[in-house]
Amino acid sequence: MRKAYLAIICLFTGFNAFAQHTDIQPVPQQISESGQLITLPGSYQFTGDTEANPYAVQQLKQLLAGNHSAKEGLRIYIGEKGDKAIRKFARRIPNQKEGYYLCINDKEIVLAGNDERGTFYALQTLSRLLKDNQLPAVEIKDYPSIRFRGVVEGFYGTPWSHAARLRQLKFYGENKMNTYIYGPKDDPYHSSPNWRLPYPEKEAKQLQELVKVAKENEVDFVWAIHPGQDIKWNQEDRDNLLAKFEKMYDLGVRSFAVFFDDISGEGTNPVKQAELLNYIDENFVKVKKDVTPLVMCPTEYNKSWSDPKGGYLTTLGDKLNPSIQIMWTGDRVISDITQEGIRWINERIKRPAYIWWNFPVSDYVRDHLLLGPVYGNDTRIADQMSGFVTNPMEHAEASKIAIYGVASYSWNPEKYDSEKTWKDAIKNIMPASAEELEFFAAHNSDLGANGHRYRRDESVALQPVAQSFTDSYIKGEKYNENDYAALQETFGRMAESGDILLTDAENTPLVKEMKPWLTQFKLLGETGEEVLAMAKAYAPFVRKIEIEVETLDQVKEAVEAGADIIMLDNMT
């Protein structure tokens, strides 16, 4: 009877019954709350913890400090659909992959996943809700809108360090991202000429650790190979590729990708590419049973580079096994994903595209930090994409601002709020200095002029003020005092924010990455303050000097006119 009563408490908490005030990223599909806050008692009765996702159980017990074997206390139900412990909540669990049901009230907490990853995501939501040993009474029914969500380390330049990758994987798990594609362009064992060779022992052990940490955070570690520049379309290289995959499989890798991007020559042949990929799919992926669908990046990976007459994309669409995922960057190398654009590519490849979004990657504008909001992608096309991964900067910690936004967008595009998510990302990454980081990021978000013609908003509030002040000053008119005050405040904040962030000990890897830009930001603020002071001191004399210059010009004209008259008199 007691169990039935407890179940009814959750089941009768109808969705949309209460105003939604709880702040969670990514935004859940459905959430309702009563307004009640529950203080955690410190003693808990666990049910299902021996059957449920072990990584979720471990983190849950770390989160809920106290006695986990109490005879009396807050009841915790945890498990996956089909487990006895959560059977009575089965109807509330979403049917979608990675979906979960979370219910919190003063009698119990229920974390019920459609699968193990769903249970893990229920825990991540619970973790976000916990503040000062209190939880809001809520009922959440949630699932991702896009199947594969995450990051592709696919930029040119200095690859991320091992420590940075470990931090990244934990970050992905916390933000419900399930994919990390390892494909750094400057890894010699990922690409030509060494793709056929096994990793040296040190690098192999590091990859093994990455795979382990990825698994603990419910992230698929996708190892990518880039063989196209020197591959031979023969059985020997087929065997070489499978042998390399076997080596990676032995290291724990269970997800694989083959990249044919940024190459030329014979390796670009779509028929041969399709034959090779199908061979891998049939002789490796399907044989292993525990390997996720194969992913490929085509040579014509954006619309502007495609040749419809050549039939490259339609060949892949016709010949590739249906389970193989095809990556796509959009209308151009660097572009946002539109409804029209996704429809165009899907018609040709005959499957939902797997989006490789080239933001905030900065390997073509390396003097810029791209710390602005994630925006521009259509929010109505989730069902037309099989995956959405972001290509980041070589600055791993700084990339987390955009990665956080992509996590939120790809989980629930229809409820995605770019500005709010951006602010939340900054608070998540550097809570104590969030105000200063937000100010710095607002002035470090655009790429500047570049060959890809891709731009982002930057210094939005400052630009009209600066333009108004400058125009007035150049014309010799009295400038607007409000403009002057706004500029003075901005330059002052630049100097102050730069100084605070440079000495911040909260996120030292982030500060280290941003240090050159922070130093410049601080100096720009200090210089701006000095220039404004000089401009103010000089302003009263501007019109006076202009009048004197005009007078001198008139005198000069008169003198020159008089000289001309004298010359004419002498000639006559």
Predicted segments with their positions:
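Bacterial Sec-dependent N-terminal signal peptides
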Residues: 1-23
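Short beta-strand/loop segments at the ligand-binding rim of alpha/beta enzyme cores
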Residues: 218-221, 291-293, 350-355, 538-546, ...
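Catalytic-core regions of glycoside hydrolase
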Residues: 251-254, 263-421
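C-terminal functional modules
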Residues: 418-533, 537
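Short, acidic/polar
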Residues: 160-171, 237-247, 312, 338, ...
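Glycine- and Gly-Pro-enriched alpha-helical subdomains that act as flexible
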Residues: 529-571
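Feature activates predominantly on carbohydrate-active enzymes
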Residues: 89, 94-237, 244, 250-254, ...
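Acidic, contiguous N-terminal accessory segments
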Residues: 17-106, 114, 132-140
